Amino acid sequence: MKTETVPPFQETPAGSSCHLNNLLSSRKLMAVGVLLGWLLVIHLLVNVWLLCLLSALLVVLGGWLGSSLAGVASGRLHLERFIPLATCPPCPEAERQLEREINRTIQMIIRDFVLSWYRSVSQEPAFEEEMEAAMKGLVQELRRRMSVMDSHAVAQSVLTLCGCHLQSYIQAKEATAGKNGPVEPSHLWEAYCRATAPHPAVHSPSAEVTYTRGVVNLLLQGLVPKPHLETRTGRHVVVELITCNVILPLISRLSDPDWIHLVLVGIFSKARDPAPCPASAPEQPSVPTSLPLIAEVEQLPEGRASPVAAPVFLSYSEPEGSAGPSPEVEEGHEAVEGDLGGMCEERKVGNNSSHFLQPNVRGPLFLCEDSELESPLSELGKETIMLMTPGSFLSDRIQDALCALESSQALEPKDGEASEGAEAEEGPGTETETGLPVSTLNSCPEIHIDTADKEIEQGDVTASVTALLEGPEKTCPSRPSCLEKDLTNDVSSLDPTLPPVLLSSSPPGPLSSATFSFEPLSSPDGPVIIQNLRITGTITAREHSGTGFHPYTLYTVKYETALDGENSSGLQQLAYHTVNRRYREFLNLQTRLEEKPDLRKFIKNVKGPKKLFPDLPLGNMDSDRVEARKSLLESFLKQLCAIPEIANSEEVQEFLALNTDARIAFVKKPFMVSRIDKMVVSAIVDTLKTAFPRSEPQSPTEELSEAETESKPQTEGKKASKSRLRFSSSKISPALSVTEAQDKILYCLQEGNVESETLSMSAMESFIEKQTKLLEMQPTKAPEKDPEQPPKGRVDSCVSDAAVPAQDPSNSDPGTETELADTALDLLLLLLTEQWKWLCTENMQKFLRLIFGTLVQRWLEVQVANLTSPQRWVQYLLLLQESIWPGGVLPKFPRPVRTQEQKLAAEKQALQSLMGVLPDLVVEILGVNKCRLSWGLVLESLQQPLINRHLIYCLGDIILEFLDLSASVEESAATTSASDTPGNSKRMGVSS
């Protein structure tokens, strides 16, 4: 025997001799046993009593050897090795049926809860596809997380929660038992709260809404695929919709005792075991589609178009020998398939016949004033303030009449820069009644009008309208629906049948038709040339920050785009664009260009804006400095656009809002915005523009202007309010003082009290010190938590506050093999305490765990696997569909209130279903009546909606913990904190 392999206490000679003696004694015993066996066999042939004695000895020997073979070091008996307990076999047909039911549920949700409101603001067909893809991604992520979830740990936590609930209810019942008469629900709830800590969500209705909103936000952040719901506004809207319209009503429904009875009947019914998958007929479903749930569908009104003509009755059990779906369920499935088929046909046919609030297709290269891209007030675009264009002083119908004169009249420009600030838009490619495509390319030069000349100009345009009516053979293509506005008093007497014509606002003077072409470009998606770029003026606006309102300057960038083609005709076709950017966005453009190695080499010799303290709230500068900075920025943009590689880069085109929305701020790091967010925002904004085309914008600068007017002399105040121009497509609504039309228009407000907004040198030093401290603290600072996010302790510890567990799973040895069985036996003994007190003694509990511990563990594992099998998930989805869409159709009217007799019948059936949870042998041993009393206590504890609501929130905390959404939330929080650095304008009130 080797020394290194033998423990120290066996290295002595005495230890070796003991080992040899034991070995020899075991051999002697074996020899004696064999000898006695031969003797007994011989005597068997002589005496029958010896046969009985031999049988008894064999039983004892089998028990002794069997316990040593079936048991382990702990002394437990593994009876599950002798009792077969099989789980549901994997069935491919069940997986396919689950996929079908998931897709069916998603389509019905989109049909009844998404498109029902989205079609009121837009008819974009791609939105439905994007929403369906996003929901499928959410379901796939949820299934992935559930597949890796520890089902045994979840079951143990749920059993612990049930045990805590029963113990607390028994204590509350004993506390209120001494009162005369029936116990009030409020008194029972107070006693229940004294026995256990209630969930924070049930403290008050406001706390419930806040907590539910946080849970929904947590689920969306962890499950919704990127980049959906990345925008703060979009996520807030979706969270509110789901919280108020889905989760809160669902929790109210789940806490209803009658609904709990129906669910228990559906889950634990005797007919719950699915039929095995037939190999020869894969088209048959693997589970019975006759749901164990009675759900009466109310008779629909006569005027309601529904494919279901009769109420659907769902049986509690499936008839024997029936493998196919019942006719009632088939009828419901046909109804759903018919509705979904009609919905798909709607998608295929399109919505060309309906009236659009806004055009579905909008050319990104050709923009007009009504859809002019907007510049944000800050990097995050916190405010959306609409302005009106100078041309809005004229009626749109009068401006439309000018398009008839462009093909027949040669107009000379009033000044050299008559085309300054012109803009055009390519509307949707709709068709006229004759089926011909309609072109909606416009040229919209700005109009600067004095109030004294307004009536004269409108009179001239009215004459143009008369000339248009006299020549009916000259027709203009229909204008986009986004340009349709109400007629003014000047043209209220016109023929209402006058077809809408192309918008073209031009200055009061001749305009050369050889300069611009009013036909759409042949290939707007092709490469374009950015030319004639200039910064025409500045706009002063204010933004709100932590310390109040701060003024800042916006620079109006205007440029033209033309097709980059060699075969272009002599008449150069142009499109005009305008975008407002602040100084910080110019710095962001320079930073993003420098961060790209392939573009950095092209901008080495380009002089960009200075980066010295760009984020300090130094107040608004005077007009001279603004003019100098404007010239520098204009030179910077011209140099960039002169380099083809830079001009065609994504950064420059995003900065100039060539293919994007200028309402989105140009930030240092670009972020992905999902198509769903873009389509929803576009539809809502377009609807608001159409609904309120001439509403007065609420400008943040109007208050500033009024304050300045009060502080200024009377004559100066009148001079400032002489002429106001408003831009309908900008976020800023400043008051612009324009005295005369100039070749190069400069919009600049001389703000009053600018010195008060400027930091002194000491204040600047103090500010820099604070920012330095923030930068030093940033790496160790924890990310900010959402106030609506559920407390992490609540999610992590499941029932730590809601209910004190009878047995903490974390304190038990993780290596034990009967953790789940021990928890279940504790719960069972709690139920049996009043009926079998002798069974709940300490010695009896040890005996039960020793003999039946592993068997109960195996039985629970099989039950958990069966309850989470694909066959069961199909059944759960069918129950959900029948609860929300009875017969496959969302009811227009609420269901009739269930009578008290129906509720009592459902309670009795639920009790009978719970009786079938335990094996029949166990029920016979314990006694049927006593088992019925114990299960009756379980149902009695679920008769209070407030207690049920507490249980639902605790159960939700358990599920959230095991879904492991913390990693996704931490990643999202890290992204948010990275964007909200200490130098961010949102925190510091930057005014550059």
Swiss-Prot record:
A single Gene Ontology CC term: early endosome membrane
Family (UniProt): Belongs to the sorting nexin family.
Gene3D superfamilies from the UniProt entry: Phox-like domain
Function, in words: Plays a role in intracellular vesicle trafficking and exocytosis. May play a role in maintaining insulin-containing dense core vesicles in pancreatic beta-cells and in preventing their degradation. May play a role in insulin secretion. Interacts with membranes containing phosphatidylinositol 3-phosphate (PtdIns(3P)).
Lineage, uppermost ranks: Eukaryota, Metazoa, Chordata, Craniata, Vertebrata
UniProtKB keywords: Cytoplasmic vesicle, Endosome, Exocytosis, Lipid-binding, Membrane, Protein transport, Transport
Positions bound to a 1,2-diacyl-sn-glycero-3-phospho-(1D-myo-inositol-3-phosphate): 582, 629
CDD domains given in the database record: PX_SNX19
Ranges where the PX domain occurs: 533-663
Compartments, record wording: Early endosome membrane; Cytoplasmic vesicle membrane
Subunit architecture: Interacts with PTPRN.
Compositional bias per record (Acidic residues), positions renumbered to this chain: 418-428
The keyword Cell division appears for this protein: no
Composition-biased stretches (Polar residues): 980-992
Biased composition (Basic and acidic residues): 709-719, 782-795
SUPFAM superfamilies: PX domain
Name of this protein: Sorting nexin-19
Annotated GO MF terms: phosphatidylinositol binding; phosphatidylinositol-3-phosphate binding
One GO term (biological process): chondrocyte differentiation
Domain PXA: 95-272
Membrane topology: Peripheral membrane protein
Organism: Homo sapiens
InterPro entries: Phox_assoc (IPR003114), PX_dom (IPR001683), PX_dom_sf (IPR036871), SNX19_PX (IPR037909), Sorting_nexin_C (IPR013937)
Stretches the record annotates as Disordered: 410-442, 692-726, 778-797, 973-992
Domain notes from UniProt: The PX domain mediates specific binding to membranes enriched in phosphatidylinositol 3-phosphate (PtdIns(P3)).
